[in-house]
């Protein structure tokens, strides 16, 4: 959100990818700044030693700034208001590459907003077809909480779950990767009410003996 807010283009890369895939994404997008953890940053430094970076778990070096140091700074800088057109690029997502090299798909500001509206429209349709059950859920004292169990570099994780929950101020719990025991623990302890994922994930959850408890 902060990246887009200053008029830049966000490029979520496959953090599980190998060095070659990261290199392709950085080169194709002509990235000028990278946010990464130490594991990914070690790959990136082998490819581009001088690319400016900010890291959550690395110290300061010639071209890397620790995020902790940025957050500790006493001086607050007001974000510059940048005029953007609705058709200006906002996010560059990469395909999975199952049929060849991953390909970049540019999403404009309008595309992103329309995608969020589509999710809300589907939600409204779901409510209208299941009003009695949905009203029971809405009457629950437990507020809506979502478990994010898919990657943010995938469109369903970023737009359909992360940004839609941010838009409505709902709690979002993020998993590093899918693990059935960890998912059940989070659902139980945090009283999660929403989980969206691949069919195999949902089936694994429903078949687990702990889920009924």
Predicted regions and their residues:
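Conserved AMP-binding
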Residues: 14, 149-154
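Conserved AMP-binding/adenylation subdomain of ANL enzymes
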Residues: 113-145, 153-194, 208
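Conserved pre-ATP/AMP-binding loop-to-beta segment of ANL
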Residues: 75-94, 100-101, 131, 136-145
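ATP-dependent adenylate-forming carboxylate-activation enzymes
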Residues: 8-27, 38-40, 170-190, 199-201
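Conserved AMP-binding A3 loop
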Residues: 90-129
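Adenylate-forming
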Residues: 36-45, 150, 178-179, 192-213
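Short hydrophobic alpha-helices that are characteristic scaffold elements of the AMP-binding
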Residues: 1-6, 27-28, 154, 166-167
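Structural core segment of the AMP-binding/adenylate-forming
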Residues: 5-72, 79-80, 210
